[in-house]
Regions:
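Hydrophobic hinge/microswitch elements
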Residues: 130-135, 139-142, 149, 201-259, ...
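Short beta-strand-centered segments that line the small-molecule binding cleft or hinge
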Residues: 2, 87, 110-114, 132-169, ...
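A short LG(V/I)-centered, amphipathic sequence patch enriched
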Residues: 16, 42-61
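Central regulatory/effector-binding core of bacterial HTH transcription factors
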Residues: 92-153, 223
Length: 315
């Protein structure tokens, strides 16, 4: 059986696009050349890899097995080439990692800015998503690491977690909001207004259940983009959340007001972030990945990153 990496890349594109036309475009090939490549791969393995009788061209059982191995092989080959280039002093490899929405709106872009200043020839690809999807893509070897909530990975020996500093988050509203001038408010008063947040972080879900007394509590507006959520808060009576790591609050320019809630103690663990860097224990990080992680951790430890907090905002 003879299989080359180019054919595997083509099959991955077909599996992702579910179309010979779109798959060919994704790898910059003519449709006829792309089809011949898939057919040659099927001839090498001795069986069909996609069900051509289905409109979505779903992989056959053999195709699913090949796809799983193909992704690992292609990812491993890319990582090998990157590491060799980096060790040769070219510093021109590619880095692929993921990030949760909150770190992606401040901490991580700042770290990338420092990183590309030191490695101007490097190519950085980072994907913003929730921790569940980031975990899946890490397992599929699309990423070397990701930055997100670490609670679900700290006790798993398959992962290495490097914790970042815990940061306090708060409920907040626009400066002209009816609750803006209050020293503190009750949970009932807070929840009488629309809530615009993401509820994926487990600590936030815990607080919302605590305040509402409902396991199925759902916000009025749910989104993974901190900038979009804050636009909703600044243009309505909706309540949002705010805290460190994000540059959203710098752009608010004093228009955000922090809300103290009677039922929430300041030392409550759920009111603090638990972000960190998650990687696979069985996979060695490339030099560029290690360098990026160093920049993220250094920025997290530095005093200048604290400008992302709420100290300069109305309280």
């Amino acid at each position: 059986m003879h299989i080359d990496l180019r054919q595997l890349r083509h099959f991955i594109a077909l599996a992702e696009q579910r179309s010979f036309v779109a798959g060919a475009q994704a790898v910059n090939l003519s449709q006829s050349a792309f089809s011949r490549s898939i057919q040659a791969l099927e001839h090498s393995v001795g069986c069909p890899l996609v069900d051509r009788g289905r409109k979505d061209l779903a992989p056959t059982k053999q195709g699913q097995v090949l796809l799983e191995h193909a992704r690992r092989l292609v990812s491993g080959a890319r990582q090998m080439a990157n590491e060799i280039n980096q060790f040769n002093g070219l510093e021109a490899g590619e880095l692929h990692f993921g990030c949760g929405p909150a770190p992606a709106s401040g901490l991580v872009p700042r770290a990338i800015g420092r990183f590309i200043g030191r490695y101007p020839k490097a190519r950085v690809h980072f994907q913003v998503d929730d921790w569940q999807r980031l975990s899946k893509r890490l397992q599929d070897e699309e990423f070397e690491f990701f930055v997100a909530d670490t609670r679900n990975f700290e006790a798993d020996p398959a992962y290495i977690t490097q914790r970042l500093r815990p940061r306090r988050w708060h409920f907040c509203c626009r400066a002209g909001h009816p609750l803006a001038g209050r020293h503190s408010v009750s949970a009932a008063e807070l929840l009488s207004y629309p809530l615009a947040v993401t509820i994926r972080p487990p600590n936030l879900r815990k607080v919302l259940v605590q305040l509402s007394g409902r396991l199925d509590y759902a916000p009025n507006v749910e989104c993974e983009s901190p900038f979009s959520l804050m636009s909703v808060v600044l243009s309505s009576d909706a309540i949002g959340i705010c805290g460190a790591y994000s540059d959203v609050f710098l752009y608010a320019k004093g228009d955000l007001v922090r809300i103290a809630v009677d039922e929430l103690a300041d030392d409550q663990d759920a009111l603090y972030t638990r972000y960190g860097i998650v990687s696979r224990a069985a996979v060695r990080l490339s030099p560029l990945a290690q360098a990026m992680i160093e920049q993220i951790k250094a920025l997290d430890d530095s005093d200048d990153h604290d400008v992302c907090g709420l100290e300069n905002f109305a309280i």
